[in-house]
């Protein structure tokens, strides 16, 4: 599933082209994705201007004129791409994914050039909703989200606050979207390895009123920031179906220290990385370095 860095990479790839563009036409190649498309979806979009493109956690927010926002989630395999006529013709002949193009918007940019904004989703777990922009952040999908890991308020102190009395694992708490918005399995595994913290460790141990606990919480917060920043710079991680807006691949997976490296040597101590299941998800870690 695309996580925060992948979604932010999509946002950064689309934003310069689509901001200020007018939606000229909308083609839906099916009636639904995970959920049915909003009623009269195409008709409601045609003629609108895309005022900007935001992100909250793993959601893309296409802000439109007339106070509506397309709330888009990529699901397990969704992607957006932007093409002119030349690139679209080329992709239609070389890409095995074109048959999974479910939404195509023709948009006219501020300079008059026409682009094709396409949503592709092999597994169809993504979805799009139309939401009133004026009450956007009161929407049930957004209202209870926690802090963004790149926000100024995200810190070791914040983690200590939310870890108080949490007997569940560090990994379990960090994957809770009401506590940290946008983090997923890959980057939690990577940040915990950098922090030398076991994914099985009780979260409450970092909330203790000791200097050691404060230092561990501060280190974890910083390593989460670092992993996210580096992944965005690399264009995200290409696992299974994820591609960037220009059709190219993300490269952060080449920098994984633990994720997907079961049986390979720990880059710090040399013993084999192990994989365990936590709540049905794979956790990769070094049993010697991470305590």
From Swiss-Prot:
The active site is at 2 (schiff-base intermediate with dna), 3 (proton donor), 58 (proton donor), 281 (proton donor). It holds the Pfam family zf-FPG_IleRS. Disulfide bonds: none annotated. The keyword Repressor does not apply. Its cofactor is Zn(2+). DNA binds at residues 100, 123, 166. Keywords: DNA damage, DNA repair, DNA-binding, Glycosidase, Hydrolase, Lyase, Metal-binding, Multifunctional enzyme, Zinc, Zinc-finger. InterPro entries: DNA_glyclase/AP_lyase_DNA-bd (IPR015886), DNA_glyclase_Znf_dom_DNA_BS (IPR015887), Formamido-pyr_DNA_Glyclase (IPR020629), FPG_cat (IPR012319), MutM-like_N-ter (IPR035937), Ribosomal_uS13-like_H2TH (IPR010979), Znf_DNA_glyclase/AP_lyase (IPR000214), Znf_FPG/IleRS (IPR010663). GO terms for biological process: base-excision repair. Gene3D superfamilies: 1.10.8.50, MutM-like, N-terminal (3.20.190.10). Its EC number is 3.2.2.23, 4.2.99.18. Belongs to the FPG family. This is Formamidopyrimidine-DNA glycosylase.
């Amino acid at each position: 599933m695309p996580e925060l860095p992948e979604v932010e990479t999509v946002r950064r790839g689309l934003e310069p082209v689509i901001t200020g563009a007018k939606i000229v036409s909308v083609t839906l190649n099916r009636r639904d994705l995970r959920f049915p498309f909003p009623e009269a979806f195409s008709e409601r979009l045609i003629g609108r201007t895309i005022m900007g493109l935001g992100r909250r956690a793993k959601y893309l927010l296409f802000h439109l004129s007339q106070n509506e926002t397309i709330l888009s989630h990529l699901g397990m395999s969704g992607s957006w791409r932007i093409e002119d006529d030349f690139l679209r013709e080329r992709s239609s002949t070389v890409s095995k994914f074109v048959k999974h193009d479910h939404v195509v918007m023709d948009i006219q940019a501020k300079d008059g050039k026409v682009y094709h904004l396409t949503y592709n989703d092999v597994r169809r777990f993504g979805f799009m909703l139309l939401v009133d922009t004026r009450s956007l952040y009161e929407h049930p999908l957004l209202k209870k989200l926690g802090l963004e890991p790149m926000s100024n308020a995200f810190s070791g102190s914040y983690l200590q606050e939310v870890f108080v009395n949490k007997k569940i694992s560090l990994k379990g708490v960090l994957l809770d979207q009401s506590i940290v918005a946008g983090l997923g399995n890959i980057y939690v595994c990577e940040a915990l390895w950098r922090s030398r913290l076991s994914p099985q460790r009780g979260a409450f141990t970092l909330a203790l009123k000791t200097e050691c606990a404060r230092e561990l919480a501060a280190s974890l917060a910083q390593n989460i920031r670092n992993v996210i920043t580096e992944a965005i710079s690399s264009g995200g991680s290409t696992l299974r179906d994820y591609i960037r807006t220009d059709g190219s691949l993300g490269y952060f997976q080449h920098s994984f220290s633990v994720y997907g490296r079961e049986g390979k040597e720990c880059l710090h101590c040399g013993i084999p990385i192990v994989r365990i299941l936590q709540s049905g998800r794979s956790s990769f870690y070094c049993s010697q370095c991470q305590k």
